[in-house]
A protein has these predicted regions:
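C-terminal catalytic/substrate-binding lobe primarily of soluble NAD(P)-dependent oxidoreductases
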Residues: 6, 25, 128, 140, ...
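N-terminal Rossmann NAD(P)H-binding glycine-rich loop of SDR-like oxidoreductase domains
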Residues: 12-35
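Structural motif
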Residues: 14, 85-86, 101
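A generic structural motif
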Residues: 36-44, 412, 418-420
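N-terminal Rossmann-fold cofactor-binding loop
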Residues: 46-50, 70-71
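Short, conserved SAM-binding/catalytic segment
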Residues: 56-63
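Conserved Rossmann-fold cofactor-binding substructure of NAD(P)-dependent oxidoreductases
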Residues: 67-86, 90-93
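Rossmann-fold NAD(P)-binding glycine/threonine-rich loop
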Residues: 106-129
Length: 436
């Protein structure tokens, strides 16, 4: 490991950005460099190539500490992790050992289910480190919309939970990132006994949640919001992964609600309680109606089927699809946006009626490249700068989800960033029902 020190206040909380020379990291560094809270924290650029790290550092408004470190160098990784308060995008094992928080953009349930949760969850609990994967477009919008739907519902009806929930994703521009495509390659190359695609793969079989079958993937989906036109959606390619994070949140709320500490924090905020049984679906609204959505889904199933079944097809795709580290133009990055609409239905009231909650989550910028950097950065800053406001589960540590580890703190940071519009309301009831 080689390090080139810069002027850095040791008193400030410090983020370690590993992989700081990647395409996505370029957007992340620019966001952190000009962040309104930048006087309150420092960050270190880390990666494998000293020269490229220096080049990335030269583009910042002020010089930062640069550390070149190989991941197969345990002493180097240990020394690097010791320099900061939170690691962004690497070294989850060393963080779990030393009690340092960690966030990343993981989108591989197989990796979480077979390698990370079994090996590091208990270790992180012992050290009180928050290990929080999937802090980007995969899967914060999915996790937080359902979290807010529960918060909105239980602010009016504390004993109710959500029995069914669906989210529609609407993209304006945007592209599939090279990192996401690389994750697909990684999963496809795994031995069959290590592949995971079930929505309950990231929760233990300890009886806290009942055994349920995974939701069947469909060609088309329909969303019926009262007094609005019906919306039809197609299969959303990140749904199989996003649902594993949603299910882990569901599991953790039930786990913590049964503990002595509960779910309320000292700051007065609390994590909502999820029910033990809940149907969850996601879809992509392509604006083509039921038939068009069904055809699009069929094409996706066919293409993905070929991709995962044939090494030859995957080899050909390497010449067509973006590679990790590749991206689109800055103009395309900033023009793109997305909107997530979640419609959730409660368990029955005593009179048999149910309550519906509508939650929206809108983000600026290409979801796979630019917006995901905003989400990742604010997640890291929430764990670093707002420790006293975090939910109780964050003080316990472990392999957590964004809503469990950060909850309202993350929602507030996203709103204040100016890059997101987030709201949630109960439908069909009187005032005092909206969270925004």
């Amino acid at each position: 490991m080689s390090s080139k020190p810069r002027t850095r206040s040791s008193k400030k909380p410090t983020l370690i950005i590993y992989g700081a020379t990647s395409y996505t990291a370029r957007q992340l560094l620019a966001y952190l460099d000009t962040h309104p809270d930048s006087v309150s924290f420092d960050f270190i650029l880390a990666g494998r190539n000293q020269q490229k790290l220096e080049q990335a550092n030269n583009k910042l408004s002020q010089s930062r500490e640069v550390v070149a470190c190989q991941l197969d160098d345990p002493d180097g990784v240990r020394s690097l992790v010791a320099k900061g308060d939170i690691v962004v995008n690497l070294a989850g094992d060393e963080c779990a050992k030393t009690g340092k928080h960690y966030v990343d953009l993981c989108g591989e349930s197989s990796w979480l289910a077979t390698d990370i949760i079994p090996r590091y969850n208990n270790l992180a609990i012992q050290s009180k480190a928050c290990i929080v994967p999937s802090c980007g477009f995969d899967s914060i919008p999915s996790d937080l919309t359902l979290y807010l739907a529960h918060k909105t519902l239980q602010a009016r009806h504390p004993v109710l939970t959500i029995s069914a929930s669906q989210s529609f994703f609407k993209m304006k521009g945007g592209s599939m990132s090279g990192g996401t495509i690389q994750s697909m390659y990684s999963v496809a190359e795994l031995p069959k006994d290590k592949r995971r695609s079930g929505e309950h793969d990231c929760i233990p079989k300890d009886g806290i949640l009942p055994k349920t079958r995974s939701t069947i993937l469909k060609l088309s989906y329909i969303m019926k919001i009262p007094n609005k036109a019906r919306r039809y959606g197609s299969f959303f390619f990140m749904y199989p992964y996003n649902r594993t994070i949603v299910r882990r949140t569901q599991y953790l709320t039930n786990l913590f609600s049964g503990s002595n500490s509960g779910l309320a924090s000292d700051s007065g905020s609390s994590t909502p309680k999820y029910g033990k049984e809940m149907k969850y679906e996601e879809s992509m609204d392509i604006g083509r109606g039921k038939i068009g959505s069904s055809i699009f889904s069929f094409c996706l199933f066919f293409v993905f089927g070929l991709f995962y079944a044939s090494k030859l097809i995957r080899k050909l795709c390497t010449y067509i699809l973006p590679k990790a580290g590749e991206g689109v133009s800055d103009e395309q990055l900033f023009k793109a946006s997305y909107a997530v609409t979640n419609l959730s239905t409660s368990t029955p009231l005593p009179d048999g009626r149910t309550v519906q909650i509508s939650t929206t989550f809108k983000g600026q910028g290409d979801p796979g490249y630019l917006n995901t950097c905003y989400l990742l950065a604010e997640s890291a800053l929430a764990l670093t700068l707002d420790k006293d406001k975090l939910p109780i589960p964050a003080s316990k540590g472990g392999l957590l989800t964004p809503s469990i580890a950060m909850g309202d703190v993350l929602v507030d940071r996203l709103r204040k960033s100016g890059k997101f519009e987030i709201s949630s309301e109960i439908l069909g009831e009187d005032s005092d029902k909206k969270i925004d």
